[in-house]
Amino acid sequence: MSHITTEDPATLRLPFKEKLSYGIGDLASNILLDIGTLYLLKFYTDVLGLPGTYGGIIFLISKFFTAFTDMGTGIMLDSRRKIGPKGKFRPFILYASFPVTLLAIANFVGTPFDVTGKTVMATILFMLYGLFFSMMNCSYGAMVPAITKNPNERASLAAWRQGGATLGLLLCTVGFVPVMNLIEGNQQLGYIFAATLFSLFGLLFMWICYSGVKERYVETQPANPAQKPGLLQSFRAIAGNRPLFILCIANLCTLGAFNVKLAIQVYYTQYVLNDPILLSYMGFFSMGCIFIGVFLMPASVRRFGKKKVYIGGLLIWVLGDLLNYFFGGGSVSFVAFSCLAFFGSAFVNSLNWALVSDTVEYGEWRTGVRSEGTVYTGFTFFRKVSQALAGFFPGWMLTQIGYVPNVAQADHTIEGLRQLIFIYPSALAVVTIVAMGCFYSLNEKMYVRIVEEIEARKRTA
């Protein structure tokens, strides 16, 4: 059985306050995540004194570990049948957010060990952080099918989520370094101070999300009691759900491209453009363009459909990066072309969450088993693998191109940074265009038919 409202699930409209609360949840998640994505590699190389390859290995091991903790979270969520008044997903948002906050701060604490000891300690802390972040963030993301079955409202929630994520990224991009610099003469304490302040705000925002969202469609009994969630079942759910599998491949590419860009832009502005403060100012413009894209996304989807808007966003992204590589030699041109690329990425990153929610019903339609947690965390498994590779690749490449911290870089190092921030993301975006254009088949018409057939089955069961 399910907890179901009396309103038609296909037409139910969500209140503004609930959409805002859901968007605030990804504001919280991205504050807690992006301080690490943006600055942790630089903290490892420039403060802890670790070689770039070691920093990359920390990301590789930790993110691969959390890929499996994501899957474990999905299995745990789909195994829950005794659902209390807090719901199926919301309790994990509430209780996991506190250890995530503490560990996000601890990641920026130095240790008095040698290089090996520092590497081991940093890896352990980052793995623990990833474990609790999986519990919090996977529950947050998997909750959408329990909130609404209206495809337009799901697209709206995806837009609000991306808006919150973009605001979190903007705050971390613009504010972290100035806050860190308030502690003069001690870079280590500056990192700790900034991480503490940002993480506490992340905790507060996540609690606001918890209090403002409502679960309406929660399965309390399995459709097939003999079929219990497990790791093998999770991978089968992905392999047997073609739209989900294609979406996983697309995210493997796009998230890897986006995270490499974020990691390298700190080095690019400092060593290529010789303007380290530019990153803070650029954030206002580039993230502003993302907000415009997020704002335009729901109307664009209603007119053209999710798939066409997704591919269109990728094409804009590629155009912006290629223009930056060939013509973006100065600060002004770098900001302008980056804004174009980030504008395109807004459609891609927003629609990922709406598309994965649609694959829940596709999987239920194909198998008779509704597994929000398994589908969502199978999706995030690929995203974490992408993050693992995106964390390792820049650190490894920094060593390969001859990066030396806190000095002027050689010409071949400069060219390596340019290729990392522009050519690598463009190539992955092109691969994604081919994958989504040729192999993704779940459109709006098919989705409506699937939902109608599922509801008909339930009425006759």
Curated annotation (Swiss-Prot):
Please give the name of this protein: Putative 2,3-dihydroxypropane-1-sulfonate exporter
Question: Taxonomic lineage of this organism?
Answer: Bacteria, Pseudomonadati, Pseudomonadota, Gammaproteobacteria, Enterobacterales
Q: Which PANTHER family match?
A: 2,3-DIHYDROXYPROPANE-1-SULFONATE EXPORTER-RELATED, MAJOR FACILITATOR SUPERFAMILY DOMAIN-CONTAINING PROTEIN
SUPFAM superfamilies for this protein: MFS general substrate transporter
Please explain the role this protein plays, according to its UniProt record: Could be involved in the export of 2,3-dihydroxypropane-1-sulfonate (DHPS).
Membrane-spanning intervals of the chain: 21-41, 48-68, 93-113, 124-144, 163-183, 189-209, 244-264, 277-297, 309-329, 331-351, 388-408, 420-440
One GO BP:
carbohydrate transport
Q: Provide the gene name from the record.
A: yihP
Q: Which UniProt keywords apply?
A: Cell inner membrane, Cell membrane, Membrane, Symport, Transmembrane, Transmembrane helix, Transport
Q: Which source organism does the UniProt entry give?
A: Escherichia coli (strain K12)
Membrane topology for this entry? Multi-pass membrane protein
**GO MF, one example:** symporter activity
- Subcellular location per the Swiss-Prot or TrEMBL entry: Cell inner membrane
